[in-house]
């Protein structure tokens, strides 16, 4: 036992963080234009004058942040962040990297708390948490390489012989092409799939019925033995969500994902109504 502890201490001494590098990679090739009502977006209700161009601006992935955490024993862990990569790079370079250089990657909980607490005044969500996540992923990647084990082993190991998965695409599109895409997933053997709903509060009652058409179209193709889910990307208001959920109730969805902005659940009296 004493030898084992000595070995663990030796590993900790060798696995100190010596550098943290953040780099933004930018896509410079052609970009396919996103059509109107591709998917709902939380910014829709404030972008009325230019909604067709701005509908999906908050989720465009034309840049990508990659974080490298290098250890004293020569391992390099990789992490990444897709949303707001440029601001996240600034957070990593200015706040996170100086705070964790010299720490052992095996003290990962201490490192996480250190990053979180040093960004608490302006962090706690958004860019701050995204930057912390990118570094945290890189640390776990370095841990796996150092231990010569896949990270899932370090997190507790296998609990099942296999895991269910679902097809997650089915963005709003003409109904015939939506049906074809759903049929392709059935042919591939998927027993669950998730679609995106393209209309929100600014589209009124007509948009509600268009959302229902999307769901009914997919359901008619996949049948009742396939789980069906829908994602809204926080594009609805409380009032709209309540009205839509009454219409959706008969469509046998397994879940409705992110109907409203999550933090509003803690500040609005309507939260209990939506939950019920």
Regions found by a protein language model. Give the residues of each.
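Solvent-exposed alpha-helices and their adjacent loops that cap or buttress functional pockets
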Residues: 59-60, 157-159, 221
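Metal- or metallocofactor-binding catalytic centers and their adjacent structured scaffolds
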Residues: 54-55, 70-146
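Structured beta-strand/loop patches that form or line metal/cofactor-binding pockets in enzymes
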Residues: 12-72, 82
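Generic detector of well-ordered alpha-helical packing
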Residues: 81, 137, 142, 195, ...
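Single conserved hydrophobic/aromatic residue that forms the stacking wall/gate
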Residues: 1-7, 11, 266-276
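Glycine-rich, aromatic-flanked loop segments that form ligand/cofactor-binding clefts
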Residues: 127, 136-168, 172
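Metal-dependent enolase-superfamily TIM-barrel catalytic cores that perform enediolate-based chemistry
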Residues: 162-265
């Amino acid at each position: 036992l004493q030898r084992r502890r000595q070995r663990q201490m030796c590993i900790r001494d060798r696995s100190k963080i010596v550098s943290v590098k953040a780099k933004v990679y930018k896509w410079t090739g052609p970009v396919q234009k996103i059509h109107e009502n591709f998917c709902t977006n939380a910014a829709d209700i404030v972008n009325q004058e230019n909604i067709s161009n701005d509908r999906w601006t908050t989720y465009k992935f034309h840049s990508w942040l990659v974080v490298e955490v290098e250890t004293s024993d020569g391992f390099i862990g990789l992490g990444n962040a897709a949303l707001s990569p440029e601001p996240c790079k600034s957070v990593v370079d200015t706040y996170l990297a100086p705070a964790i250089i010299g720490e052992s990657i095996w003290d990962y909980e201490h490192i996480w708390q250190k990053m979180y607490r040093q960004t608490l005044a302006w962090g706690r969500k958004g860019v701050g948490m995204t930057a912390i996540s990118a570094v945290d992923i890189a640390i776990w990647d370095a841990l796996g390489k150092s231990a010569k084990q896949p990270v899932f082993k370090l997190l507790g190991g296998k609990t099942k012989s296999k895991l269910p998965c679902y097809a997650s695409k089915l963005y709003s599109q003409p109904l015939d092409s939506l049906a074809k895409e759903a049929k392709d997933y059935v042919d591939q053997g998927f027993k669950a799939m998730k679609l995106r709903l393209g209309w929100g509060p600014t589209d009124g009652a007509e948009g509600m019925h268009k959302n229902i058409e999307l769901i009914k179209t997919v359901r008619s193709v996949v049948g009742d033995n396939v789980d069906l889910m829908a994602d809204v990307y926080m594009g609805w208001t409380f009032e709209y969500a309540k009205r839509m959920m009454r219409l959706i109730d008969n469509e046998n969805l397994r879940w409705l994902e992110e109907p409203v902005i999550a933090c509003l659940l803690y500040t609005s009296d309507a939260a209990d109504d939506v939950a019920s």
